[in-house]
């Protein structure tokens, strides 16, 4: 994304950041510089309404736009682009969104639920510097680090996430996630638009690439998580709506 802005492949990007007024509260943001992208870097574990920034991009007349989001947001973007072709704003999104980056996502948690969880484990949210969830909950604060079991957090999952079947952002141009070894990111190139930008970044020495083995532990894990999420909603649908 930084490379795309620096090389003028895009003029702006839709991302998320955190509110200065509420700890860890995600908000949508339209960014125009590599510096802004880096300032917004980091995982969000409560829902960030990224697509709200599309309206600002439309009103400002951004010519070439990138969009970053989790699978449901990328799906929403595609609906905006293609399901209402006679609406002016849909035509604009289709023409001016140059590429999308999808983030691997199992689920997110409600903001109030996450704040309650921190209260339960004795952590002041305003002191949290980094939160990471990989099988366990890793919390880095100004006062030290905690590693907690994930089970206690599950009850605060966002209900809508239980109906989502897409783990790897299948409709994005490029999908990325932190399943690889330390310092590496698994990247799935899905479209010509995504491939063109990715290969350009590689050509200019921006990205270091290590082709993944089809039998690697990381790829097997990715397939497992995709399959798990693809089948997970079915029991919930039967429970809510009947058999």
Feature-to-residue mapping (PLM):
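Iron-sulfur-associated redox domains of electron-transfer enzymes in respiratory
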Residues: 1-243
């Amino acid at each position: 994304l930084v490379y795309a802005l620096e090389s003028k492949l895009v003029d702006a990007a839709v991302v998320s950041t955190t509110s200065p007024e509420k700890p860890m509260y995600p908000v949508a943001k339209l960014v125009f510089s590599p510096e802004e992208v880096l300032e917004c870097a980091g995982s969000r574990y409560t829902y960030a309404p990224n697509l709200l920034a599309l309206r600002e991009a439309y009103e400002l007349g951004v010519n070439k736009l990138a969009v970053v989001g989790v699978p449901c947001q990328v799906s929403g973007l595609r609906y905006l682009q293609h399901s209402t072709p006679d609406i002016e704003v849909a035509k604009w999104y289709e023409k001016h969104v140059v590429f999308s980056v999808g983030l691997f996502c199992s689920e997110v948690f409600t903001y109030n639920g996450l704040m309650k969880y921190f209260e339960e484990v004795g952590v002041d949210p305003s002191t949290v510097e980094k939160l990471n969830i990989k099988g366990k909950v890793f919390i880095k604060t100004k006062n030290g680090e905690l590693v907690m079991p994930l089970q206690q957090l599950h009850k605060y999952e966002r209900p809508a996430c239980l109906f989502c079947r897409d783990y790897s952002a299948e409709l994005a141009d490029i999908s990325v996630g932190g399943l690889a070894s330390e310092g590496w990111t698994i990247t799935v190139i899905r479209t010509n638009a995504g491939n063109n930008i990715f290969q350009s970044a590689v050509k200019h020495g921006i990205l270091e690439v290590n082709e993944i083995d089809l039998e690697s532990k990381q790829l097997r894990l990715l397939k497992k998580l995709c399959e798990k999420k693809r089948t997970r909603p079915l029991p919930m649908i039967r429970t809510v709506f009947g058999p």
